[in-house]
Each structure stands twice: as C-alpha cells, then as structure tokens.
Amino acid sequence: MNKNGFSRCADIYIGRLREEGRYSTAHVYQNALLSFSKFCGVHSVSFRQVTRDRLRRYEQHLYECGLKPNTISTYMRMLRSIYNRGVEAGSAPYVHRLFHEVYTGVDVRQKRALPVVA
C-alpha cells in the first residue's frame, strides 16, 4: 500500500475533475484535502492516518475554527468520497462505518435573505 495513498488518490481524482471541466467541485475537494493535511501536520496523508478518532478530532477542530455545520459536512463528505475511491481501487483497507461518528448530513435552515416582494 502506498504510504501517501490518500493524498495521491485525492490528487488523481481532483485532476480528473479538472479535465472534465468540473473546476468548482475540484476546488472543494482540494480545500478539504488541504485542510485535513494541515490538521494532520503532513503534506501527504496516508490511508492509515484516516481513522475514526482523527476524523472526530478534525471535526471538533473545524467547529473550534468557526466553520458552519454544512461546511464541515461538505469537507467530511469529500474525504469520505476519496476514501471510498481508495477502497474501490484496492489502495485502502475497508473500515466499516469509518465516517459514522462525524456529521455528513445537510443542515437545512431558513435563509437570512429578505424575500423578494413582487
């Protein structure tokens, strides 16, 4: 297994998204990867570093940094997607319900903008 497999898998997928012209999606994946890499204190994250405990601590770190639940959920869903691609490619071991204890939902709230009056 590649020691820097998680970041490598992410970089390959981000490159593919850019080739398909999906620049906004690639940008979100890139931001999630950079944020998680900084949290881990490494330039390249290995699949071994993606653990339940680390994901919980990362989620708490993002809350403490003032990020909103939907932003945190977006980052977690991007990381989960990268992990799942690694599992499918045989680059990562499957860990049952790895992302189960972190928030990956979408918080639906009333918009703050004023309604348009016709």
PLM features: residue spans?
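Structured, charged N-terminal subsegments at the starts of enzyme catalytic cores
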Residues: 9, 28-31
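N-terminal core-binding DNA-recognition domain of tyrosine recombinases/integrases
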Residues: 12-24, 33-110
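Short, intrinsically disordered, charge-balanced linker/junction segments flanking boundaries
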Residues: 108-118
